[in-house]
Regions:
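Short, well-structured beta-strand segments within conserved domains
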Residues: 24, 55-62, 384-389
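Short, exposed beta-strand/loop patches in secreted or surface proteins that constitute
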Residues: 2-3, 31-38, 79-83, 132-133, ...
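Beta-propeller and closely related beta-pinwheel folds
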Residues: 71-235, 264-270
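Exposed aromatic-hydrophobic patches
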Residues: 10-13, 44-48, 368-377
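Surface-exposed, short loops/turns at beta-strand junctions within beta-sandwich domains
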Residues: 49-54, 377-381
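Beta-sheet repeat architectures centered on beta-propellers
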Residues: 176-180, 186-190, 196-413
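Solvent-exposed, conformationally flexible loop/turn segments
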Residues: 5-10, 53, 363-369
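Extended beta-strand solenoid/passenger and fiber regions
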Residues: 1-38, 45-47, 62-77
């Protein structure tokens, strides 16, 4: 669009060496009396056809096919919708030839378009590769491996006094960023990324402040440290499962789940997910071999075998405070639906051999609440753990409490 002044007969396009000028309109009506210089990118009007003075009253449409310029957009590997109250623009990044560039679309005839990317709609952000962009309310957070920026839609005024939307970029944090490409999550309206010190929640994204990212992964700090030391961050992914209030952190060493409603961590073995997707009622995950799986609470078999459910305590001294003790017995109280078998195993330590294992059965006809009790032979240890497992396909039990009896030189309890 151009604003005619009533006297100018030559208007310069935004590009040179265009393929053709398709049409020219004045006040919305297609007009004649013009010629195009496609080599120099200009349109000239004959006397009597010069556009009258007006605001955005002249429209010139031209085309220029450029495979190289198309690839600037089509080689981008990630993107998001953002801009205004209804996210009217597409923001793209991840072009390996332009690793620190952000490209964004423009409205076409006042409507959102995923096909119209003006040549000037880009931002160069720092000097490092962009790893992710996520939205928090009206802010767009932009990450590299060691820095964070933010952007938002800002109305600005041009030389003629016209308002136009702009998306400036501001510094947010010079120490922390996102190490996993394309895997930042938004947990309970708070962005989450993996940084050099662990998983971080971005609690304040309005101004630059080194305290706006807070690490919350201390309970799995040893695993995170090993991931960073071995360069395995690229093999991890983060996913927020809003329906259950859980954050999934998939690593080469297991799937760690943070229940942010209960502030608890737990781990699943044997899951090497590289991507998650939830369809209402079912969570799917893709492994690095391209196989698709889903989680189910109804299935009792997996790969033609009965699923073993188990729970284990942390390695603990059970209050012995570093002194050697004997683990005399373990008692497990369960609330049974239809009877079950439980195997209770006591280990002297996390990597030691099984010292004592006992399988006990409960018939529902006997009692709805039953205590499983067995003595152990673990003696003179400084730490131990207990594992409770069940391989029944159609029986279950809710564990209500576990009681340990220990003895050392000072006390028996």
């Amino acid at each position: 669009q151009f604003s005619g002044d009533g006297t100018s007969s030559v208007y310069t396009l935004g590009e040179k060496e265009v393929d053709s000028v398709l049409w020219v309109k004045t006040d919305g009506v297609e007009t004649e009396g013009w010629t195009a210089d496609t080599q120099n990118g200009t349109v000239s009007f004959a006397q009597g056809s010069i556009p009258q003075k007006g605001l955005n009253n002249l429209e010139i449409c031209w085309e220029k096919a450029s495979t190289a310029k198309e690839r600037i957009i089509t080689k981008c590997t990630a993107g998001m919708n953002f801009g205004g109250n209804t996210d009217t623009r597409v923001f793209l990044y991840g072009n390996p030839d332009y690793p620190n560039y952000r490209f964004y679309s423009e409205l076409a005839n006042g409507l959102p378009s995923a096909e119209y990317f003006p040549e000037t709609n880009y931002t160069v952000i720092g000097s490092s590769t962009l790893t992710d962009m996520v939205q928090q309310y009206d802010r767009q957070l932009i990450f590299t491996e060691d820095r964070a920026y933010y952007s938002y839609c800002e109305l600005r005024t041009d030389a003629l006094g016209n308002y136009y939307p702009s998306f400036p970029v501001y510094n947010l944090n010079f120490e922390k960023g996102n190490l996993i490409k394309g895997c930042a999550a938004v947990m309970d309206n708070t962005p989450v990324t993996l940084s050099d010190d662990g998983l971080n929640r971005w609690i304040s994204t309005t101004v630059q402040d080194e305290r706006n990212a807070v690490c919350f992964s201390a309970p799995i700090s040893h695993t995170v440290k090993h991931i960073l030391e071995t360069g395995n961050a690229k093999n991890c992914c983060i996913y927020d499962r809003q329906s259950t209030g859980e954050l999934y952190f998939s690593t080469p060493y297991g799937l760690y789940i943070y229940n942010y409603k209960a502030n608890l961590w737990y781990r699943y073995d044997g899951i090497d997910a590289v991507q998650f997707c939830e369809i209402p009622g079912r969570l799917y995950w893709l492994n690095k071999e391209g196989k698709l799986y889903y989680f189910s609470e109804e299935l009792t078999q997996d790969e033609n075998g009965v699923i073993t459910a188990y729970w284990c305590t942390p390695v603990s001294n059970f209050g012995a405070k570093g002194k050697k003790f004997d683990l005399l017995s373990v008692a497990v109280d369960t609330d049974n639906d239809n009877g079950t078998d439980l195997t209770v195993t006591a280990n002297p330590n996390e990597i030691g051999q099984i010292m004592n294992s006992q399988t006990v059965s409960v018939d529902r006809n006997n009692s709805l609440l039953r205590r499983f009790f067995f003595k152990t032979e673990i003696k003179r240890v400084t730490a131990a753990k207990v594992i409770i497992s069940s391989t029944h396909e159609n029986r279950q039990a809710d564990i209500k409490s576990i009681t340990f009896k220990i003895k050392n030189k000072e006390v028996e309890r």
